[in-house]
Amino acid sequence: NVLYVKGEVLSGDTLHVLVCHLPSRLGATRVSRRHRMLAVRTVRAVADSVRTATSDARILWMGDFNADVEDRVFREVVFPYFREPGLSPFCADGVKGSYRYRGIWETIDHILVSPVLMDNSRPFHTSDGCRAIVAFPFMCEREKTYGGVRPFRTYQGPLYKGGYSDHFPVTLDFEWRFPE
């Protein structure tokens, strides 16, 4: 699933936003990886179309990629054209990713930007350390089996738990300067 939004930010710059939820890693690894790669190439094609129309397009690509940055999908398709701003060192106690499965933290939710958005000489930009994983106490629950905390999910299988998500949200701060 991909959502494309185009809008104008306060600095007057046009921002193109691509939001995706890539196929799960569950099931046959080779099949799910192939589906994720196909989905990423589809989103990249949309981004390439935007970039063809405007060479210095400000593009933000975000969502649940179901892959970490070491995955082949990032090396081959994403990182040649997008950057992921560095993560803020400030995170809730014990939280080391956006998702936890069987006691292991992973960051599979990403916010990527076109390189022009990392240029701090531009009126509208971001920089390393401006990306954060948000894990307020009300978003967490104690994990009995593996210890520590995990996201407080809405459902666990068919059981309604009353939480909000099985992933912590990822945010990105921007700065902008108005023309003098």
Residue ranges, per PLM feature:
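Beta-strand elements within well-structured catalytic alpha/beta cores of enzymes
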Residues: V17, L60-W61
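Active-site metal-binding loops of divalent metal-dependent hydrolases
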Residues: L22, D64-F65
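Metal-dependent phosphoester-hydrolase catalytic domains
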Residues: K6, V50-I59, A67-E180
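A long, amphipathic alpha-helix that forms part
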Residues: R30-S55
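A short secondary-structure junction signal
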Residues: G27-S32, V73
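Structured beta-strand-rich core segments of catalytic domains in phosphoester-bond hydrolases
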Residues: N1-L22
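A surface/extracellular/periplasmic glyco- and lipid-processing/surface-interacting theme
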Residues: E8, R36, L60
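Flexible glycine/proline-enriched surface loops and loop-helix/loop-strand junctions
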Residues: N1, P23-A28, A92-V95, Y155-Q156
